[in-house]
Amino acid sequence: MKFKNLALLLLITFSTITAYGNNVSTDPINDKNKEKAKETIVGVAASNDNFTTLVAAVKAANLVDVLNGDGPFTVFAPTNDAFGKLPEGTVYSLLKPENKKILTAVLTYHVVAGKFDAKAVVKAIKANNGKFVIKTVQGNSLTAMIKDGNVLLKDTKGNVSKVIMTDVEASNGIIHAIDTVVMPQ
């Protein structure tokens, strides 16, 4: 019995060392993220149940081709819960064809040209005395800051959103999930 346990322990140890030495990932979450990196921002968002409202909005605004483009883009992606915080009827109203221009402005306010992972955002905040002004594709800016260990985004109206998930890789950029929809001026 002792020999069997020792053999099993050696096998597990050897397998772990071999996998580590060959740089093979045994982390299913990490592997899944690497798989998704083959997909564009829209593909990654569409495969995540937390972004169904965002994906519907991107389709309604005819931004799928843009966000499937080469990029790179950084998207501060509002979750379904973030859209749920908006006043009742707001999402329904924004999705109407006659409000496409407004919807496009709101969505592109969440997109930044270039790829900024969480580490780069934090570094920029620290390098700029605690506030990093980010110009969005929409044209207005967001201000990134750190409070209580969380990265926050402040829009031009003074609304604040917290980054709740970072560094979701896509083939043409990166997604950071946020808990509140930010609004342009």
Summary of predicted features, one role per range:
Residues M1-F3:
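N-terminal secretory signal peptides that target proteins for export/translocation
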Residues L9-T18:
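Bacterial N-terminal signal peptides
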Residues N5-L6, Y20-Q185:
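Mature, structured domains of secreted/extracytosolic soluble proteins
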